[in-house]
C-alpha cells in the first residue's frame, strides 16, 4: 500500500546503515525497515539530491508490518518505491512534532525506566519505542573518545518529569556535524560547548527512541537519541531516537 509519511529522524547505525522513522497522514508513527543488512545510507539520495531527511514528506510502498514490542512501529517497505514529495514548511513541521509531545521519557514508553546498566526498559513489552518530548533543561553535550578509541556523542538533559538522562546521540546530521568540525580543526570540547550554547538558547524538541536488544543484555532495550537538529529563529528541534545504543 502506497502512502505518504513525514520523516522525523535519520539515524546512524553500523557499517553504513541508517534507521528512519516518521508519521503518516493519520498521525501513526512508522519505522520503515528492510531485511538484513537493512537500509544503506546511499538510499537516502536520488543521484546527488537528498530525498529522505528530517522534515521531508515522502511516499513509500509499505508491505508487511512486523511489530515486536516495544518496536511496534516497524513496517517493511519497497526501497525502489520512495518518492520525494516536499519539504515540510517550518510551522507545519513544528505543529506535527508538538502534537506528539509527551511529558517525559517514561511517559513515551509507558513502562518503568530501569537502571544499571545505564537506563533501559525490558524487551518484549510496551506500546511504542519512539516519541517526542520538550526537555525542561539541557545540561551537557558530550563529545569525546571512549576507552575503546571510538568517538562518543551524548546529551545530558532533564525531562519534564524531573528525571535526568545521559543518552547516546545517533542522529546522522549531529554526527556528521561533529565529525566535520573536528576535520576543520575544532577540538571536541569546543564542539560540545558550541552545541550546548545553541541548544540552551533555543526551544528544543527531543525525539527519543529505544535501541534493539544486544547480545550482552538480550532482555534490555536502551533509550537514546536519533534524529536531527534543526535551528530556526529561537527554535531548535533535536530529534533523538536510538535504533541502537
Task: For every predicted segment, state its role.
Residues 1-60:
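N-terminal ordered "arm"
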Residues 1-4, 67, 92-245:
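Nucleic-acid-binding small beta-barrel platforms of the OB/S1 family
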Residues 27, 79-103:
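RNA-binding basic/glycine-rich loop and surface signature characteristic of RAMP-family CRISPR effectors
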Residues 40-41, 50-53, 78-82, 96, ...:
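Short, low-complexity, polar/charged sequence segments that are solvent-exposed and flexible
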Residues 53-56, 71-73, 207-211:
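A composition-driven signal for long, intrinsically disordered, charge-rich low-complexity tracts
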Residues 61-63, 78, 158:
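A structural detector for beta-sheet-dominated domains
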Residues 65-77:
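Short, Lys/Arg- and Gly-enriched loop/turn segments at beta-strand edges
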